Amino acid sequence: VLSIIVPTLNAEKSLPGTLAALAEAARMALAHEIIVSDGGSRDRTCDIARRSGARVVVGKPGRGIQLAAGAAAARHA
């Protein structure tokens, strides 16, 4: 399984395009999951991610922390 982890913080404007591009690229993999690891956004980032079919993990901000949380949430971590 290919797990794609996207760390975010208040990314409602850029996230739809990012998720659409990742979903298109992930279609080439046999199995995939997209995980949005959010650092406490105050906008609609998490709602947008969920509506696109991504799994959402919310935790502390910080790219490394968010990547680790996303990796821990991956189905085959």
Task: Give each language-model segment a name.
Residues V1-S3, E33:
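Cell-envelope/extracellular polymer assembly enzymes that use nucleotide-activated donors
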Residues A11-A26:
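Short, well-formed alpha-helical segments that are part of the catalytic scaffolds
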Residues A11-S14, S41, R63:
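Donor nucleotide-sugar binding loop of glycosyltransferases
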Residues A25, R50-A54:
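Short, conserved SAM-binding/catalytic segment
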Residues R27-H32:
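A generic structural motif
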Residues D38-C46:
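A conserved acidic beta->alpha catalytic loop
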Residues R51-S52, I65-A77:
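Active-site nucleotide-sugar/metal-binding loop of Leloir-type enzymes
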Residues V56-I65:
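Short, acidic/glycine-rich phosphate-metal binding loop used to engage nucleotide
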